[in-house]
């Protein structure tokens, strides 16, 4: 568990005294957090929690708060797929940064329930290869796999934003950073949270 995760009082049914736990209370409230780079561990954790909450109650929505620089493509796609699989709607809320796979996951929230905080930033780009050293055949196979993943992510953005394929493909050629307003206009989020005074 990362440093800085708050401990909250949580009382188990039938117990008199509450105990201080880290995030179990938040999970029971159906609040999930992606506050780091996407990797196998955090993806498996999020998917496991979503599946558990889906089995526990299919009528209550889940809320996924995102502040992520992105990360590995396959774990990110698995989180996206899990969000589409579960019965409850998954609200996605961008706080800070949703870059790379973080923005793909943000886009995967239930349409009309994707939110960005006023000063949030979103970034899209194409997936990169991590395989630079090896035999030519291995590099070619890796390049083919990266192209398949790029096609998959492009289709996700096309489906979830309503933008034409050529626009998404062109924009993914480089890092495209967006403000909350620009992300809304692009179709990655549907709402911008209001500042309270």
Swiss-Prot record:
Entry's EC annotation: 3.4.21.92
Keywords: Chloroplast, Hydrolase, Plastid, Protease, Serine protease
TM helices/strands, residue ranges: none
Any one Gene Ontology cellular component term annotated for this protein: endopeptidase Clp complex
EC class of the enzyme, as a word: hydrolase
Biological process according to GO: protein quality control for misfolded or incompletely synthesized proteins
Annotated compartments: Plastid, Chloroplast stroma
Origin: domain of life: Eukaryota
A Pfam family this chain is assigned to: CLP_protease
PROSITE patterns referenced in this protein's UniProt entry, alphabetically: CLP_PROTEASE_HIS, CLP_PROTEASE_SER
Entry-linked InterPro entries: ClpP, ClpP/crotonase-like_dom_sf, ClpP/TepA, ClpP_His_AS, ClpP_Ser_AS
Main localization category: plastid
Molecular function GO labels: ATP-dependent peptidase activity; ATPase binding; serine-type endopeptidase activity
Reaction(s) this enzyme catalyzes, per UniProt: Hydrolysis of proteins to small peptides in the presence of ATP and magnesium. alpha-casein is the usual test substrate. In the absence of ATP, only oligopeptides shorter than five residues are hydrolyzed (such as succinyl-Leu-Tyr-|-NHMec, and Leu-Tyr-Leu-|-Tyr-Trp, in which cleavage of the -Tyr-|-Leu- and -Tyr-|-Trp bonds also occurs)
UniProt-listed CDD domains: S14_ClpP_2
Protein task: Cleaves peptides in various proteins in a process that requires ATP hydrolysis. Has a chymotrypsin-like activity. Plays a major role in the degradation of misfolded proteins.
Subunit (UniProt): Component of the chloroplastic Clp protease core complex.
Name the record gives this protein: ATP-dependent Clp protease proteolytic subunit
Organism name: Angiopteris evecta
Lineage: Eukaryota, Viridiplantae, Streptophyta, Embryophyta, Tracheophyta
């Amino acid at each position: 568990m990362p440093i800085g995760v708050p401990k909250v009082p949580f009382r188990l049914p039938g117990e008199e005294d509450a105990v201080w736990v880290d995030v179990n209370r938040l999970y029971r409230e159906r609040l999930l957090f992606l506050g780091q780079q996407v990797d196998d561990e955090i993806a498996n954790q999020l998917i496991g929690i979503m599946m558990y909450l889906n089995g526990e109650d299919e009528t209550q929505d889940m809320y996924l708060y995102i502040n992520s620089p992105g990360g590995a493509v396959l774990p990110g796609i698995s989180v996206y797929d899990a969000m589409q699989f579960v019965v409850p709607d998954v609200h996605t809320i961008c706080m800070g940064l949703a870059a790379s796979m973080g923005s793909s996951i943000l886009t995967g929230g239930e349409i009309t329930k994707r939110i960005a905080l006023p000063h949030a930033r979103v970034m899209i780009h194409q997936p990169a290869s991590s395989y630079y050293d090896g035999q030519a055949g291995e590099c070619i196979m890796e390049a083919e796999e990266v192209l398949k993943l790029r096609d998959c992510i492009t289709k996700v953005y096309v489906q979830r934003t309503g933008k034409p394929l050529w626009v998404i493909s062109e924009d993914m050629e480089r890092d495209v950073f967006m403000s909350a307003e620009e992300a809304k206009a692009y179709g990655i989020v549907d709402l911008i949270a209001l500042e309270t005074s």
